Structures are given as structure tokens and as C-alpha cells.
Amino acid sequence: QRQMCIRDRVLNMAVTTASATDNVLQDLLRYDLNVANAIISVIKEQGITDLVLGLHQGKGVVSSFLGNMTEAILGQSNVTTLIYRPIQPIATVKRHLVVVPARAEKEVGFPMWVNKVWNIIHNSGAKAVFYASEDTMVYLKEMYKKRPIEAEFSSFDDWDDFLIMSREIKSDDTLWVVMSRRERLSYHANMSRIPNYLNKYFQSNSFVLVYPIQAGETNNRYL
């Protein structure tokens, strides 16, 4: 009963907050013994294209940086997914550092996540710094021509040297890292180390992990 009251209060708060910004939020309730299963099923039933998840707050030793629920959702769904760890209000962020893997432009979900990130940066009024390979940079600069924002572009294609970002990032910066599921076009083996790097070297900054829509089958056994 107590959990149901908390659930209703959180949903009502979200609806009220959205209304205060002239947005409409449709609250959905789903009863399921498995939280990941519930979210995955709603994604399919409602035709959801974008998913925002907060980074879990694990207590003690956890087997996964992202958490078992998030890992399950990523493995069994194929929507643009943003995993967000907020350290400061987004309105106070001065720069968004966006790290993009090579061949990201070849993924089917490339235009979708680029538009989402671009809108957030544009609406925040903050500066963007994109780190990408030369080939990928061509596509990002095309977007820049169509929708100019305050931005810089820096060549980056060595994910084995990802920790140079710890020297680039400053206070009031948010770090965006575009990821990939295993065995997809833009996957790099060193991506498996990114969660550990973030946990160890970027504790003072907000960050967002972006998992784009990608070609290939997902495991639908829970749907």
C-alpha cells in the first residue's frame, strides 16, 4: 500500500511539473513482477521511440554499473535510450562535450539521436564540443549548417585513449557518450570500460550515455 502511494505521488508530481512548462505528460501504470519486462512491454504496446532512464543508485557492491534492469532493457529493446546521471541542473551547464564513435553515421538511429541531442543543446543555450572521427564529423557539420549552434568540432577516433576527456572536461560541463550495443557497426571493444571510467574519473560531472536505434534483432522473449 505504501509503495502504491509513493508511485501515485511521483506520477502526479511529474504531470504537474510538465503542465507548469506547457507540456502534456501522459502517465501510464503497468503492473508486472519484473520492472524491465513492464518497461519493454510498454515500449512495444505504445510505440515508444525514445526512453530516458536515470542511472540506478546501487547500494554496496553491484554487478553492473548500469544496473540489471537497464542492462535487460538495452538488450531487449531497440529505441533511442538516454541514461542520465544528473549532478547539476541542466540550465546551469555551460558546455556539452559529445563523444561520438567512428561509423556512428552508418547506424539507422543516427539522425534520431543527433536531433535529440541537438535540440537539448540548442534549447539550453550552452556550447557544444563534438569529438568524432573525420568521416563522422562530415555528417555532424552538415547538421550544423542546417541548424547552427555555438559549437566546436574536434577529431577523436582513439577510444583506447578515452581518458583524455578527463583533461578536457571542466566544472559545469556535461559529458555525452554515444555508445553501441555489441556486434553493431559502431561498437568498439573499449566501450566496455566506459562505465568504469565514468565512475572513477568523472564523478563531479553530469553525464548521459546514448544508445541509438541499431539494425539487428533484439531478444523479445519477455514481450
Region locations from a protein language model:
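Short, small-residue-biased leader/transition segments that mark boundaries at the very start
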Residues: 2-6
